[in-house]
Amino acid sequence: VMGRHAYHHALGTHRAELDEIWSRRDDISWHNPAGFWVGRETLYAYYADAKAKQDEATLKLMAKFNPNIEVKPENFQMGALMMHSLTTPLIEIADDGKTAQAMWYSLGQVTNAGPDGTATGVWMHERYAVDFIKEDDGWKIWHFFVGNDLGCEAGKPYAEYIPQEPAGE
């Protein structure tokens, strides 16, 4: 399941991810340093639709400077590269076999191209804590927590990184 999450996240196909590997329950949740979202419609709005709008805006900006770039959904990830590897899995299935809890460490990066052809990149060292629930068609993500240990611009020394307060504090 988490391998499919990493795949969808890298492609930016968050709507397909929500449809395929997340629980059908109404109380699914996603937490990252920017905030906490609960409910299927809320996750569609934040995790899927907002990402697509961001990708479209970036693509429109790039197309202004390069008329060969077509602004269409198939190109929304153009100029972006996301990768979040999954390491050190720790998975425990409840005695009743209906739920599971798991943790991973993720070393990732996000790179975005600017309209002028330059790129910016960010390194991310994160912890994932995920609750799974077993449904008729297999294990599904129920709750997903992303904790950021370190995130800094690529090319800058880690020692210059200044930690930010978590959202809401």
Residue positions per predicted region:
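Short beta-strand segments enriched in hydrophobic/aromatic residues
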Residues: H9, W22, S106-G108, F145-N148
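Short beta-strand edge/turn micro-motifs at domain boundaries
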Residues: T99-M103, H125-A159
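Short, cysteine-centered beta-strand-loop-beta hairpins and adjacent loop/turn segments enriched
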Residues: G108-V122, G151-C152
